[in-house]
């Protein structure tokens, strides 16, 4: 989240990014910069390139805007304001000095306001800010570190201003350098960087000395709080004093030579913290030992109580067992006595019943025999009645069946007689029809023979005349012509059969 917010704030100026990080509402004020500051310095401060932070420069593969300014200078040939050449270093030192002073003053004001606000917010001991960097409250606070590197020549000019500034800060931080101090907002001037710069300036000429301002802003955005793990006394004891010292050094105000009063306060504060940590550890150790002793005593007492309870429980169990055995014995004895009494009573009752039975055995046998005879008679009578009823039903069925069979036989006889009559009638009709047909044929033959003797000479047919001058393409014969031809052929055959004279142009008309 910190990298994402840093990418979002690249296009803003340094003042705007600081206001956003510290959570101060930006008012519509004009930045108090000196008139001698050049446009190149403003562009350098407002440039979107990320300045170096305590984590180092951003990787060159993430974005082209995040590249090192030296690489941009070598690749594109464009010079940046805070990395000028040796020729322009002497001319722009005064302007840069004023702008840097204004910038540091503004940061000091912001620092004082934030310290006052934290003092008001953390007045009660319950709302103390955790010192550890991985604490959940520190995640939501911004972490600001500013490294100011100056050459030895410029240290003499700024010595007075820096001492006054450190004095003010020490006076303000006396009341605020408590356990509730916000360790995330710190200013530090690296001694190693100053010594390296002094060594370099001895080798380089005065004209090539240049002052660089590196404002590194690292934002710790609010992250999701991790699930708290149960901390035991063993885990707390494993944390060494070196880790505590490193954390305290990171949370120190200034580590430079010029801030001797703050170093003394810081050392006192560190000693106080170490003493508190030792006392806390001793208290924790004593509490742990006391807790272990109490736990041991509690376990011993619980073991003794358990043994006593086991003994009491065994005694009670034995008593219960003895009581149960006695009760079972009594119960079994009572059951045996009751069973003996029941057997005796049953034997007495049996003897009484046997005597009564021996007296009335004969009577009972007679009665039983009579009853059996009656039952047999009744059964025989019922069987005879059933047989009679079955015979009567069978006879009635037989009669009906015979009647039906007789009726069917009579019907068959009648049908056969009727068929015979019909056949005889058909035969007589056929014989009569044959006789009539034969007589008719004889008559017809006699008529034909008689007619064949009288050959009639007919007039020749009139030639055909068309109804108009138009002649049809195809001549269609009429049905009368075919009929006349058939008649003529039949007449010829009759004539030949009767051995008559051959007809020349005559045609015989058949009789109908």
Swiss-Prot record:
Residues 30-39, 78-95 have a biased composition (Low complexity). Keywords: Cell projection, Cilium, Coiled coil, Cytoplasm, Cytoskeleton. Its main location: other. Residues 178-200, 260-302, 310-386 have a biased composition (Basic and acidic residues). It comes from the Eukaryota. One of its GO terms (biological process) is mitotic cytokinesis. Expressed in amphid and phasmid ciliated neurons. It is found in: Cell projection, Cilium; Cytoplasm, Cytoskeleton, Cilium axoneme. This is Protein maph-9. GO terms for cellular component: astral microtubule; axoneme; ciliary base. It comes from Caenorhabditis elegans. InterPro entries: MAP9. Residues 267-429 form a coiled coil. Residues 24-103, 168-386, 481-512 are annotated as: Disordered. One of its GO terms (molecular function) is microtubule binding. Residues 230-239, 502-512 have a biased composition (Polar residues).
